[in-house]
Amino acid sequence: MTTPYKHEPFTNFGIEENRKAFEKALETVNNEWLGQSYPLVIDGERYETENKIVSINPANKEEVVGTVSKATQDHAEKAIQAAAKAFETWRYTDPEERAAVLFRAVAKVRRKKHEFSALLVKEAGKPWNEADADTAEAIDFMEYYARQMIELAKGKPVNSREGERNQYVYTPTGVTVVIPPWNFLFAIMAGTTVAPIVTGNTVVLKPASAAPVIAAKFVEVLEESGLPKGVVNFVPGSGAEVGDYLVDHPKTSIITFTGSREVGTRIFERAAKVQPGQTHLKQVIAEMGGKDTVVVDEDCDIELAAQSIFTSAFGFAGQKCSAGSRAVVHEKVYDEVLKRVIEITESKKVGEPDSADVYMGPVIDQASFNKIMDYIEIGKEEGRLVSGGKGDDSKGYFIEPTIFADLDPKARLMQEEIFGPVVAFSKVSSFDEALEVANNTEYGLTGAVITKNRDHINRAKQEFHVGNLYFNRNCTGAIVGYHPFGGFKMSGTDSKAGGPDYLALHMQAKTISEMF
């Protein structure tokens, strides 16, 4: 009998004991974890390759977090074959035994929770609170999905007639290719890996090239937790060479992808083509980003509105698909809200996230830095720069939290996903107009409405077309089991990660009817 699910609590770093524990974890990671080399893992065997992926600290380009062997198409083929072979036994493993692997993995991660979070500080430049939340979410995914599988194994009730027994059960699907992002490098990577595993599928994991070390560490945890060889296969590599090969392979049954719209739609298109020897249609589970809006009504709490915009825009330097990169504010409170957001933003510290007092660290790499700085130049032409706007990539990839005012709703800064610390303000004259602007992008992931008007809340519930809608809070920070996460429109397939329907996406429903 398992205990009821409850999300992993966040660490309060205002408590000195917790601060010291995390400082010790950072020291451990610096002295013992950094600079290691990690092989491919295929069918339980280790493969070292000549070509490597080098993971660096985005806050300090001179610091190597680790090197990871880089897979070729030959390795990808071996991984698919190993996963297909392991599927023939893993699919029949008792669901409670599969769930037990996740519970053991959770215990191992919890024992080194601060060390894993400290690794995220190094590999992704996450501030302490963001890193701690990422690790907590990874724990939550394992805890939640393990419990969900135990329930799902019972099947669903259907009607039976006299002399007839009918069952509706779920069966595993097959080989799952998992392509996670670099931003939630532990949480999403872990969640999208263990969901197919616990449902009886096998996995080929191709981690993000910008953050492969945490994935290598997690594969070690799964192996130490009793996961049989071949159930998860670790093949970091380029998207063009390895990613496409895995997506196209006739033995691939499911592709789970989190990342950009461009790559996601390409995967969706490639997966739809039936390859020679393929005996099934591939399932694609995709989350492809957002252009998310915080709507501020005229009847609102000004401080709450400002804090919500700030948190939504600049948490983890805006490198979240859920980030509130658009603030659509009623003209009656526009100036006051904008002024307060600027004040909050300019009071926060930006720098290397090794220190507890740093609110915002670097962006992930040079390509991201260049892209964001290009968008800042576009913003200077489209709107009014009121805070930030400078970048410094001399040591790490640092960009000031940047605020633009007076944007046209159809401006590029209001339409295109930037994935950086940039928020654009647009003024509206009514709640009708606010909803119209909120819905005017091709995305539909998250949104928030700050208002005291109950009628407007009820309207937004119906008319604000996003997968995750929040009222009187920020539009980021979904909790597994509490806020199932996934978007509408071009934000993806609305596969709600951390929700009651998610595991079923990895399985096939089977009807069994027996006469007696």
Curated annotation (Swiss-Prot):
Catalytic site: 287, 321
Give the GO molecular function terms: 1-pyrroline-5-carboxylate dehydrogenase activity
For this UniProt record, the keywords arranged alphabetically read as follows: NAD, Oxidoreductase
List, alphabetically, the InterPro entries matched: Ald_DH/histidinol_DH, Ald_DH_C, Ald_DH_CS_CYS, Ald_DH_CS_GLU, Ald_DH_N, Aldehyde_DH_dom, Proline_metab_enzyme, RocA
For this protein, what is the EC number? 1.2.1.88
* Record GO biological process: glutamate biosynthetic process; proline catabolic process to glutamate
Family matches, as PROSITE patterns? ALDEHYDE_DEHYDR_CYS (PS00070), ALDEHYDE_DEHYDR_GLU (PS00687)
Q: In which pathway does it act?
A: Amino-acid degradation; L-proline degradation into L-glutamate; L-glutamate from L-proline: step 2/2
Which catalytic reaction applies to this protein?
L-glutamate 5-semialdehyde + NAD(+) + H2O = L-glutamate + NADH + 2 H(+)
The UniProt entry, under Pfam families, shows:
Aldedh
Naming one, the record's GO cellular component terms include: cytoplasmic side of plasma membrane
The family assignment reads: Belongs to the aldehyde dehydrogenase family. RocA subfamily.
Under HAMAP family, the record lists:
RocA (MF_00733)
Protein name per the record:
1-pyrroline-5-carboxylate dehydrogenase
Species this chain originates from? Bacillus licheniformis (strain ATCC 14580 / DSM 13 / JCM 2505 / CCUG 7422 / NBRC 12200 / NCIMB 9375 / NCTC 10341 / NRRL NRS-1264 / Gibson 46)
